[in-house]
């Protein structure tokens, strides 16, 4: 068995080499370069086709032999989505990876490298990096240096360009994978010895945060489910990038609660000229799908919480807030609201935007 595996690996390695050098190969080439009979070479070709290691590029015709190409064992990309939102001179970059391990690796090294980034955190396979426009000189390489880091963030028209400096494995991601991610407009790389730098171009989008509450009744509906349905609905548009769906607990002493008194929050990035239409569509969708007439929606555009947001969120977690107070807070801070009593909790959801999961779910944690 070991001998068969060694032979297989040797033949497959040759096939990959010929594919890289010539674009394809024939059975005769494999037979000649390995010294095995042509019939044996054909058997190996058939076997490796069945294993999906190689594919038939063109069938034989007349005196022209069939030609084959080897498929790499490496995935085309682990970078699912890369996009960015902009608010003044602040930027948040989002990188959704198919591997939690790779996302953790990038978070660790990007955070160590610092640069223009002020905050680097991971939410599952989504890496969120916040920073300001600017550039720094940062070394990458073997430990104890970080292997990869963001060294520059700048804007050119409607594009955000963040420059990544990398060494080793991350260089492969930069040169071979990132350009395939949804949201990437272009990747321009350059190499200097063992260091690879790349400019990653994405569109400058707007961050939209929507809070929802009181969309259900004791016997029908669930606010968390309707919030997620809205995020899915918006995500089907080409101009929207879904980011997150969260649940936050509020003061349990509210008599009108349907259960434990929670509200929901969704985040997404959208093209700036579509935001107004998205807001109108979202309000219409919630109004039509809510089981309760007291539904409420609150919408904030931008990266940052308005002043006094955490104070409002803290009140909603510890006491009753009147609808008049909620309306005054929304008006003073440019937050759109619509609906009935639910705007109180919807505003609380927006006010708690940016808190970690444990804080969102435990009202006893001080803000």
Indicate where each model-derived feature is located.
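Short alpha-helical segments that sit at the start of domains
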Residues: 1-15, 37
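Short amphipathic alpha-helical interaction segments
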Residues: 6, 35-50
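Positively charged, polyanion-binding regions of nucleic-acid-associated proteins
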Residues: 10-20, 207-209
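Short acidic, hydrophobic short linear motifs in intrinsically disordered regions
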Residues: 21-33
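Long alpha-helical, hydrophobic tracts
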Residues: 29, 168-294
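A short, conserved structural fragment
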Residues: 49-60
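Minor-groove-contacting beta-hairpin "wing" of winged helix-turn-helix DNA-binding domains
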Residues: 60-71
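Extended, charged/glycine-rich binding lobes that contact polyanionic ligands
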Residues: 78, 82-165, 173, 180-181, ...
């Amino acid at each position: 068995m070991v001998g068969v595996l060694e032979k297989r690996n040797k033949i497959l390695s040759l096939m990959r080499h010929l594919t890289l050098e010539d674009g394809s190969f024939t059975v005769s080439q494999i037979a000649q370069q390995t010294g095995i009979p042509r019939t044996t070479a054909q058997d190996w070709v058939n076997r490796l086709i069945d294993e999906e290691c190689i594919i038939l590029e063109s069938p034989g015709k007349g005196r022209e032999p069939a030609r084959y190409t080897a498929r790499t064992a490496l995935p085309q990309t682990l970078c699912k989505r890369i996009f960015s939102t902009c608010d003044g001179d602040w930027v948040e970059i989002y990188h959704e990876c198919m591997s939690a391990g790779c996302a953790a690796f990038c978070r660790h090294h990007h955070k160590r490298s610092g640069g223009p980034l002020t905050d680097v955190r991971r939410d599952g396979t989504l890496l969120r990096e916040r920073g300001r426009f600017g550039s720094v000189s940062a070394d990458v390489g073997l430990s104890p240096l970080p292997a990869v880091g963001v060294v520059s963030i700048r804007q050119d028209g409607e594009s955000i360009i963040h420059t990544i400096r990398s060494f080793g494995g991350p260089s492969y991601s930069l040169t071979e994978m990132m350009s395939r991610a949804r949201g990437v407009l272009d990747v321009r790389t350059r190499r200097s010895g063992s260091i690879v730098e790349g400019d990653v171009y994405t569109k400058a989008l707007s961050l939209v945060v929507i809070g929802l509450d009181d969309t259900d009744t004791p016997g029908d509906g669930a606010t968390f489910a309707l919030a997620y349905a809205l995020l899915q609905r918006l995500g089907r548009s080409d101009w929207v990038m879904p980011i997150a769906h969260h649940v936050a607990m509020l003061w349990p002493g509210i008599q009108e609660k349907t259960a434990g008194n929670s509200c929901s929050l969704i985040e997404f990035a959208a093209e700036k000229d579509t935001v107004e239409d998205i807001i109108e569509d979202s309000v219409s969708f919630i109004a039509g799908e809510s089981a309760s007439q007291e539904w409420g929606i609150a919408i904030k555009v931008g990266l940052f919480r308005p002043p006094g947001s955490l104070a409002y969120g803290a009140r909603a977690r510890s006491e009753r807030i009147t609808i008049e107070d909620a309306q005054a807070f929304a008006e003073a801070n440019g937050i759109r609201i619509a609906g009935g009593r639910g705007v109180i909790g919807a505003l609380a959801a927006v006010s708690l935007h940016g808190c970690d999961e444990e804080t969102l779910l435990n009202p006893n944690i001080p803000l």
